[in-house]
Each structure stands twice: as C-alpha cells, then as structure tokens.
C-alpha cells in the first residue's frame, strides 16, 4: 500500500470536509475586496482554535492588528515564491508576537493562506506528525532537511527559527502535492469535485493520516479510533 492508495480512498471525505468550512470562503472574499470584518475574523480564528488560552481583550487586539496590517504585508507581490512567503510569514508573526508574545505558527500560516489559497500551506501538528513518518519511507521527502518539532518562540529572535521551520514544512507538503498532482487531477474529474484548492486537499489528507482521532479508509477497510 502507498500514499497514493490512501489519497484514492479518502479523497472524497477530505474534500467534503473542506467544502464544509464555509467561513474560509468568506475570509477569502473579504480580503479580495480589501474589506475589514472583525467579527468574521474573530469567529474564523475561534473556529480554528487559534485563540486557546487568550483573553477576550487580547483576542480583539490580535484581530485588530491583523486587519490593520494584512494588506500592507501581502500587497505588491508579483511572484509568491519561498522568499516572499518567508518574508510575509515573519512579518505577520512579528506583528502578532508584539501584541501577545506566544508562538503564532498555526495562526500565521492559516491567515496567510486566506490571502494566497493556492500558494500558502497551512501548518497543523497532525500534518507534521504524518510528514515525520512519511519522510523516512519516501525518497523524495528524504531530500529535505529532517522535519523536527516546531521550535518554541520565547523571544523575537526565535521568530526567524520558526519561519525557517515553516518553510521546510511547507516545502514538503508542496512536494507531496507535486508528486500526486496527476492523481488529484484525475480524482477531481472522476468525482466532479468543486473544492478548488488542491493544496488544502493534500493538507486535509495528511491531517487525516496524522490525526489519531480521525477515521480513514484503506483497501475497503474503515479504520476507526478504538
């Protein structure tokens, strides 16, 4: 069995889950029109669990900082390459850290994805877990630096380390996407799938693989949590 088999068996479920996240589309639309909807951003971040352990006052401050800086951070980029992504990631995480000093890895990646939904990879610890195993059995992933646990962010100097970690992480997710692009194109046609962002479909499939509480299908067997 291989990752290709896993993708075949779980593609429809992954896409269904992604289509069900309606606020993603609202966030993308808000940004495309340069609008500022603090209630939407707050609700979206809460739904993704990005406010855990943060006071109501700090939540509002983070939303305000995001809305006041996102268009400055993301404007005037002709090519969304790694240098550009790392620069935007560092800028946004720095803005958030200045408001509430904690690791904003997941929030930064997810919010940047809303601006560049076909170019930016979101970070998730379950995906990291899946990649950690896949790297040892997948030759093209072994070409990348060994993925490690995301670094702690205890001061401003650690933000650069976190950005470097994220770039290596997203490089591997994109490598998996590139390796399976033909398969994903075929599955999209066969299932008449309308969810548009393959990069998030791959993320969801890896999330299913790395999440011990998520059921999946393989070789006509449904594997459920004990």
Language-model segments: which ranges?
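An N-terminal alpha-helical hairpin/helix-loop-helix interaction module that forms a charged
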Residues: 1-100, 117-226
């Amino acid at each position: 069995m291989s990752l290709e088999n896993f993708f075949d068996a779980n593609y429809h479920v992954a896409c269904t889950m992604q289509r069900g996240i309606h606020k993603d589309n609202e966030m993308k639309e808000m940004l495309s029109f340069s609008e500022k909807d603090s209630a939407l951003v707050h609700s979206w971040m809460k739904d993704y669990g990005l406010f855990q352990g943060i006071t109501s006052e700090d939540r509002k401050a983070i939303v305000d900082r995001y809305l006041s800086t996102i268009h400055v951070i993301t404007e005037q980029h002709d090519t969304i390459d790694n240098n550009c992504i790392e620069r935007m990631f560092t800028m946004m995480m720095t803005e958030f850290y200045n408001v509430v000093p904690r690791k904003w890895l997941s929030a930064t990646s997810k919010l940047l994805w809303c601006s560049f939904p076909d170019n930016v990879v979101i970070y998730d610890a379950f995906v990291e877990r899946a990649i950690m195993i896949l790297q040892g059995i997948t030759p093209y992933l072994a070409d990348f630096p060994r993925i490690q646990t995301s670094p702690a962010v205890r001061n401003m100097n650690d933000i650069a380390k976190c950005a470097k970690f994220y770039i290596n992480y997203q490089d591997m997710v994109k490598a998996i996407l590139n390796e399976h692009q033909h398969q994903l194109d075929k599955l999209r046609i066969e299932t008449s799938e309308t969810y548009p962002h393959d990069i998030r479909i791959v993320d969801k499939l890896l999330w299913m693989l790395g999440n011990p509480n998520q059921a999946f299908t393989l070789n006509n067997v449904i594997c459920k949590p004990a």
